[in-house]
Structure formats: C-alpha cells, structure tokens
Design a protein with these regions (language model features):
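Conserved class I S-adenosyl-L-methionine
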Residues: 1-37
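Class I SAM-dependent methyltransferase SAM/SAH-binding core
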Residues: 42, 49-95
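A short acidic, Gly/Pro-enriched loop at the edge of an enzyme's catalytic core
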Residues: 97-104
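Residues lining the SAM
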Residues: 108-110
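A short His-aromatic
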Residues: 113-115
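A short glycine-rich, Lys/Arg-flanked "PGG" loop and its adjoining helix->strand segment in the class I
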Residues: 122-134
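SAM-dependent methyltransferase
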Residues: 139-213
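C-terminal lobe and adjacent flexible extensions of AdoMet/dcAdoMet transferase-like proteins
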Residues: 202-258
Length: 258
C-alpha cells in the first residue's frame, strides 16, 4: 500500500511530540549566520507542511516538495489557515524540478531515510546542488543505523488517541540496514465509527562517514555535522558519536560563480 495515505489524516496528531519549533529555530539561526535572512527556500520532503509554515512565518519565501498528495492536502489546509504564500509541488525528491534556484534547501524529520539506495541519495544531493544559489545552504537530518538497529528495531508501539488508535511494528533488516514498519491505523470517521487502514513504510539508516562521502561526491561542500537531537537555536552543538540517533548536516554549494 502507498505510504502516507491514511496516515496523512492523523500524521500531525501522531507527530505532536516532534520538536519542529526547536528545529526551525536552529535552522533559522544557521541560515542567518550565513546572511540568509529572507528569500527563496525549499522544504524538501515537506510532508504536512509544519516546518514549511514555521519558516514562512519567519519571512522566507517557501516552496514545499513532497511525493504524497495526501500529505500535501494537509499542508494546503495549513496554508489556507495561516495565509502564508507557499508553493507546494507534488514531486519525488529523486527527480524533482524547480522553476529556479534557492538560497537554501532544508530536509528534516527522517525524509532522506526513505531513500534506500546510496546512488539515489547521491542523486538527491546532486539535484539539491543544482538548485542552490551560489554559496547556498543545504540543511538536513538523517537517522543512523544505530537508531534503527539498536533503539527501535523490532519494537512494537501501540497507542490510543482521541481520533485514532494505531499499532506500529518495526522489523529491522541487518543486511540492508533497512527498517520496515507496518502501521495499522483505526481512524474515527464523521459518523464516530473507526475505519481500519494499513500501511508499510521502509527507511534506511545511514552512517555519518557515508553521508559525508556522498555529499562531497555530489559536488556539495561539507561544512559540519552534529547530533541532531540537540537542535534548539541556543543549545550547544553536541558532536556526533556512536550513540547518535539523528545527525544534522550542513552542506554548501561551492562551485558556482556569483
């Protein structure tokens, strides 16, 4: 079954503990350090548009790209509510096309972990590089092998919420470094009845050195990386370690002339 179909309806409710505000503060702080205080910014793998909205409200001219029409419908509902002028495009990040270049590209909340092959991840990096202004920034996070193998691998989570209940089963493939998670959702409809929906998602963990290598092979310049769980604007950048579950990377376009 397609990813983020029924899940899109309840995604924000299930992800309510994700620290989007803190992540946005860190991203905005970094961009301002590089004198990117406004202008065109792409949210790649934007999902339901939470990060896109936060950056738009901070004064950036936002474009959001996502593969799921259902998730983009949720993003557009937020856009209608906020009044922010955001362009949403339904595209695969492995072959996305834009109308021009961006001052920065952001990609957060595990979006790149859906890329299961190294050559495809490199292709995403190459496309990002192509659509960055000279000296533009690429800010992204990615979950590690350690997180899938040692923290959530083979874990089952079940919860009841106001409008839905879910069972989230994880199955980790050591050979491929791929985590399969099967979602069984029970979503309350307008009649008060619960409809059962099932989805299967696959995410791959990546090691720090491999991601750094692919950044450089794509033509981007690696700037720095740090533990992605400490992402508030004023928090200390914690170095990457073997226990890091999420790594935040900063890369930069470094070959185009102004």
């Amino acid at each position: 079954m397609d990813e983020y179909t029924g899940f899109a309806e309840v995604y924000d409710e299930l992800m309510e503990d994700v620290p989007y505000k803190e992540w946005s503060e860190r991203i905005i702080s970094i961009m301002r350090d590089y004198d990117i205080k406004d202008g065109l910014v792409l949210d790649l793998g934007c999902g339901s548009g939470t990060m896109t909205e936060l950056l738009a409200s901070a004064g950036y001219d936002m474009t959001g790209v996502d593969l799921s029409p259902e998730m983009l419908e949720q993003a557009k509902l937020k856009k209608e509510s906020s009044g922010n002028d955001i362009l949403y495009l339904c595209q695969d990040m492995r072959d996305f096309e834009l109308y021009g270049t961006m001052r920065a590209v952001v990609c957060v909340c595990d979006s790149l972990n859906y890329i299961l092959e190294e050559n495809e991840l490199k292709r995403v990096f190459e496309l990002v590089n192509n659509y960055l202004d000279p000296g533009g920034l690429f800010l992204f996070d990615i979950n590690t092998v350690h997180k899938y193998r040692d923290v959530i691998g083979d874990m089952t989570i079940a919860e009841n919420r106001d409008d839905c209940s879910f069972i989230w089963e994880n199955f980790y493939d050591e050979d491929k470094a791929v985590n399969e998670y099967d979602l069984t959702l029970f979503i309350r409809n307008e009649n008060g009845l619960y409809e059962k929906q099932e989805e299967t998602h696959f995410q791959r963990g990546y090691e720090y050195e491999k991601v750094k290598q692919l950044i450089e092979e794509s033509g981007l310049g690696f700037v720095e990386a740090f533990d992605g769980e400490e992402t508030g604007a004023l928090s200390e950048k914690v170095p990457v370690s073997k226990d890091s579950e999420r790594i935040f990377f900063i890369a930069r376009e470094c070959t185009k002339k102004v």
